[in-house]
Structures are given as structure tokens and as C-alpha cells.
């Protein structure tokens, strides 16, 4: 049976993934997840894939569970969503600090409601995901992570092998990375983000400038992450002064508190946001879902179409900067 990772890699190579729906930091809240999947026209109200959905990748940037009280039913939902994805679709689950700290607690002998098979499922998920020119990560990219990525690219000419290599080093062995503080830094769990990027190296170059240079060497110009909310709204062009030349998008709007939150990335790299404010401005739930499904081609006509410019402005970055 082909795994979610294998299916995803094959689709990526074929270049058939048209849209990517990005979820972040849902913390056990299946209502928020199901609601977004329904709004986008990918699933029914119960979270089951709709017939006819094609060429979508769902990426969760981590913290799909709560580290203190992980719900088995939340894990089972994502497991089923991943395994039941249509042939031209895939589900990428990245581990966040909640999943990593949960594994750390289990490794130290603390019991959890999750079974051994469910814990094994967590350990099968990736730390990061690269698609075209976009890096998907739980938190913020660090120099150490990007230097490793660049080394793999220089040795093998591609980054597809990196996820497997890092997953092995991250979860396996006596000195597995997930057990250490470095493991959290690897997924971008930086405690003082601006201070980190403003720090100067031995050569005097600021960390943020070096991170920007490494990302550009990797062919990455956009980073989409979760982990830290910005006034309960997604934030586009975050840290543009600290990490020049890189578009950083914070997708964490605390969906478990606001009711919904996601980003949709099309094949050109254009990003649209799903959140309560955009829904309100565009006329409420029914009108909003109709417009989103029209853009994504998941409506009744199954054909993507353009929206008027003023509607696109609400879904795009302009609306986010006003929040």
C-alpha cells in the first residue's frame, strides 16, 4: 500500500498539485478542521472527502494535537483523512512542538491516552515540506536547518530525499533529535524570534540575512508556518525587515478559538486566506463558501473561476495587514 508520503512525492514530481490548503495549530479541534475542509469544498460536514475532488494537497503545519491532552479521535481523523485521500490528492502532516513534546513526555515515561500504534503514526510524519518555491514548517526557519537542507541539495541535487533522512534522524535511535531541545529548534520553535534573526554571527552577518541567503540558495522565496498567532489573524509578509527578500506567512490564527483559519496556495504561489473576518466582509458563511468553491473549482460546476477584484482583495494579503 502506498503511503501518504509516497503518494505526495509522486504527485509533486508529476506537477499535478493545483492547490494547497494549509491548516495550522488546530490543537485537537476537529470542528475547526472539518469546517475549513467543508468551506473549501473538499469534504462534507463530517470530514469525508467529496467525490470528484482532484489535485489538492492539504498541509497541516503542526500542533494538530494538544500535548497535554492528545485526543485519540483527533489523531484518528487525520490518519483517515490522509489514508483516504483521492488518488490525485494528498495530506501532509508536519509535527509541531505539541507533537514533539508529546513524544518527549512518552520517552520520559509519562503515560498518554494514545496507543503505541498512534504514537508510531506521529513518528512517521515529516518535519517540513518543500513544494516548488515554498517551505512549509511549523515555526521559523533556522540557520542549522537550512544549512542541512542545502547540504542535501548539493549532494543529491534535490530535496525530496531530505524528509526521509531527517525523519530517520529525528525519531530513531538512542540520541534521536526529538528528545533534545535541538529537536524543537529544528521545527522552528524559537523562543525570541526577532532577537534570533537580529543576532550577529562571528562574521558580523545578521542571522536573518544569512537565513534569507540560504533560502534563496535553496530556491525558496516563501515560508508558510504556524506556531505563534498574530492577534488571531494570519499575518502576511511577517519579519520582512529581519529576513529581507523572503515572504514569511504566519498562518496561526488560533482556529480553535476563532472557529476557522487556513491559507490556500494556488499553482502560481498566490495565497488566499480563510478566516472569520474575510467571511464577514464577503457576506457570511453561505456567500463566502460559494466564492471560495468558485475560486477552487470545488463548487457545483467543478470549474475554477476568477472573482471580482474587490473580493480577491479581501481574500488576499491586503485584508490581513488591516487587522
Task: Give the ranges of each region predicted by the language model.
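Short, surface-exposed beta-strand/loop micro-motifs that present aromatic residues
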Residues: 9-10, 123-130, 262-264
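Beta-strand-turn-beta hairpins that frame and shape the catalytic cleft
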Residues: 11-21, 128-136
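Active-site neighborhood of phospho(di)ester-bond hydrolases with catalytic His/Asp-centered motifs
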Residues: 23-24, 58-63, 92-97, 136-137, ...
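Binuclear metal-dependent phosphoesterase catalytic core
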Residues: 236-323
Amino acid at each position: 500500500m502506498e503511503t501518504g508520503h509516497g503518494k505526495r512525492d509522486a504527485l509533486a514530481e508529476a506537477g499535478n498539485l493545483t492547490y494547497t490548503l494549509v491548516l495550522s495549530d488546530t490543537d485537537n479541534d476537529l470542528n475547526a478542521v472539518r469546517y475549513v475542509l467543508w468551506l473549501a469544498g473538499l469534504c462534507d460536514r463530517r470530514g469525508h472527502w467529496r467525490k470528484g475532488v482532484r489535485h489538492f494537497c492539504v498541509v497541516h503545519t503542526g500542533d494538530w494535537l494538544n500535548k497535554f491532552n492528545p485526543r485519540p479521535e483527533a489523531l484518528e481523523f487525520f490518519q483517515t483523512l490522509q489514508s483516504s485521500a483521492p488518488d490525485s490528492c494528498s495530506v501532509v502532516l508536519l509535527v509541531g512542538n505539541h507533537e514533539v513534546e508529546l513524544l518527549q513526555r512518552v520517552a520520559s515515561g509519562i503515560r498518554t491516552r494514545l496507543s503505541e500504534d498512534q504514537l508510531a503514526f506521529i513518528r512517521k510524519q515529516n518535519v517540513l515540506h518543500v513544494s516548488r518555491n515554498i517551505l512549509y514548517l511549523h515555526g521559523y526557519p533556522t540557520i542549522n536547518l537550512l544549512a542541512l537542507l542545502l547540504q542535501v541539495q548539493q549532494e543529491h541535487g534535490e530535496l525530496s530525499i531530505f524528509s526521509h533522512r531527517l525523519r530517520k534522524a529525528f525519531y530513531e535511535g538512542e540520541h534521536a533529535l526529538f528528545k533534545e531541545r535541538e529537536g524543537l529548534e529544528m521545527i522552528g520553535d524559537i523562543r525570541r524570534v526577532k532577537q534570533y534573526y537580529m543576532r550577529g554571527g562571528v562574521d558580523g552577518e545578521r542571522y536573518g540575512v544569512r537565513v534569507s541567503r540560504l533560502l534563496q540558495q535553496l530556491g525558496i522565496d516563501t515560508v508558510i508556518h504556524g506556531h505563534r498567532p498574530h492577534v488571531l489573524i494570519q499575518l502576511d509578509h511577517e519579519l520582512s525587515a529581519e529576513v529581507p527578500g523572503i515572504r514569511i506567512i504566519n498562518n496561526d490564527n488560533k482556529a480553535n478559538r476563532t472557529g476557522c483559519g487556513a491559507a490556500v496556495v494556488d499553482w502560481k504561489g498566490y495565497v488566499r486566506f480563510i478566516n472569520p473576518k474575510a467571511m464577514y466582509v464577503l457576506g457570511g458563511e453561505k456567500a463566502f463558501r460559494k466564492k471560495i468553491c468558485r475560486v477552487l473549482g470545488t463548487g457545483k460546476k467543478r470549474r475554477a473561476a476568477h472573482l471580482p477584484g474587490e473580493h480577491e482583495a479581501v481574500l488576499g494579503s491586503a485584508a490581513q495587514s488591516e487587522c
